[in-house]
Amino acid sequence: MDPLSVFFLVVAAAAVCTLLLQAYAVYENFDSILEFNDAHASLEYSKSLGGSYIDKHVFDPNDGVADVTQKWRCALYGKVYVSASAFGFYAQPDGSKRTFSTRDDCVDFTFGTADTSRVVNPCTDPNGAQAEDCAFLKSVL
């Protein structure tokens, strides 16, 4: 046998061994595979979860941030929720901090596709009029 034939014989033997190992792995785990398929069969042809679902994987303001204090989060401020970060709070068009009645509303806004370009930072107020907001912001970071 020439060396080229030996090489192809070794490659073919390795391919057959790999296929046999994969078949054995499926055989050993077949019960688990059936259990998984039964548990997730209802999702096989589904296109979406339905309702007012927001895909939070498309836009996440924390993806490009390495510093943990700069990551956006929803925090309970009194009886309302606010979106907070080292940059400040997400703001209303009039410049006041944006508040949410539920945590889900806050999460949907913060990690949804809403306009998040307005930010107000109470710690940069030279008059110190927003000292309470600044203290809260520093406490949640």
Curated annotation (Swiss-Prot):
Keywords: Disulfide bond, Fusion of virus membrane with host membrane, Late protein, Membrane, Signal-anchor, Transmembrane, Transmembrane helix, Viral envelope protein, Viral penetration into host cytoplasm, Virion, Virus entry into host cell
Virion surface side: 22-140
Chief site of localization: virion
GO annotation, biological process: membrane fusion involved in viral entry into host cell; symbiont entry into host cell
Transmembrane segments: 1-21
Pfam families: Pox_A28 (PF04584)
GO CC terms: membrane; viral envelope; virion membrane
InterPro entries linked to this entry: Poxvirus_A28
Modifications made to the protein after synthesis: Contains two intramolecular disulfide bonds. They are created by the viral disulfide bond formation pathway, a poxvirus-specific pathway that operates on the cytoplasmic side of the MV membranes.
Record's bilayer topology term: Single-pass type II membrane protein
Compartment(s) of residence: Virion membrane
Family: Belongs to the poxviridae A28 protein family.
Record's function text: Envelope protein required for virus entry into host cell and for cell-cell fusion (syncytium formation).
Protein known as: Envelope protein A28 homolog
